[in-house]
Every structure is written in structure tokens, then in C-alpha cells.
Amino acid sequence: MGVFTYETEFTSVIPPEKLFKAFILDADNLIPKVAPTAVKGTEILEGDGGVGTIKKVTFGEGSQYAYVKHRVDGIDKDNLSYSYTLIEGDALSDVIENIAYDIKLVASPDGGSIVKTTSHYHTKGDVEIKEEQVKAGKEKAAGLFKLVEAYLLANPDAYN
């Protein structure tokens, strides 16, 4: 099995604590609300939402995928970090065993946020994942992120 790691950064005008509450802690409710064609809903299959929880995300009509299951690996509300692993679903394809994500929010000098994401693609066999193959996923994640940011800007009292 090979492991390929990719890093991404997004910036936001939203302070990190507020963005963490919305984009991480309440994502199961907020993302289907702001992007219903992308994500239909999220269901907890095992656990209480904390570490070890297994969630099933069902994608909307606008997605090329039907669903994914992921396991929550870590939540650190004090340090604004979250980690999870995609463990099942048609987004994994036949060459990817799983994808582990580490997300960290930090304050930017202008009072907004820098969202740092590290993705670890664990492949089956010696398959190599190319940057182009993950680009579409990164663009969709950036699109969801911008929808959440727009919601927070339009609703300044939300998630205070």
C-alpha cells in the first residue's frame, strides 16, 4: 500500500472559532442547508458524534457520488483541529483503501482564518495518485467552504 499526502490551504474573513463551530462542529446540519444539491444529509451510524463515530454522508443530485462513510479520528475544540478518515463509498474508487484528513484552523493576521488541510491517500497496491486526480475533490471542498463562509457573512449572529 502506498500513501500519498497533499496539503491545501484556504483563507477566510471569518474568525477561526466561529468557522470551526460552523464548518466542523455543525457541518452535518449546515452543509445540507447551504449546499442541498451537493450533500443531501448526514447520518450517525455508530457513536455519539465524538472520536470513533461512524457517519454516512449521502450526496445530492448534483454529485457524481452516492455516499461515503467516514470515521471521526479526532476533535480538539481548544486547538481548532479535526481529523477523520473516509472508510467506504464510491468516492474511494477501486484503487484507494481510505483517505485520512487532518484539518486545522488558525487565526490570520487580519482577524480571519487560515484553514490547513492535509489529505493522506492510502492506495491499494503500488497505485500512484496524481495531483490532477485530487484536484476536482479539492475544488469541490473549496466550493463548500465558500458557501459556508457566505452563509456566515449573511448571518453574522450565527455560531457566536
From Swiss-Prot:
UniProt key word RNA-binding: no
Highest rank taxon of the organism: Eukaryota
Entry's Gene Ontology BP terms: abscisic acid-activated signaling pathway; defense response
Keyword terms of this UniProt record: Allergen, Pathogenesis-related protein, Plant defense
PROSITE patterns: PATHOGENESIS_BETVI (PS00451)
Family designation: Belongs to the BetVI family.
Protein name: Major allergen Pru ar 1
Organism: Prunus armeniaca
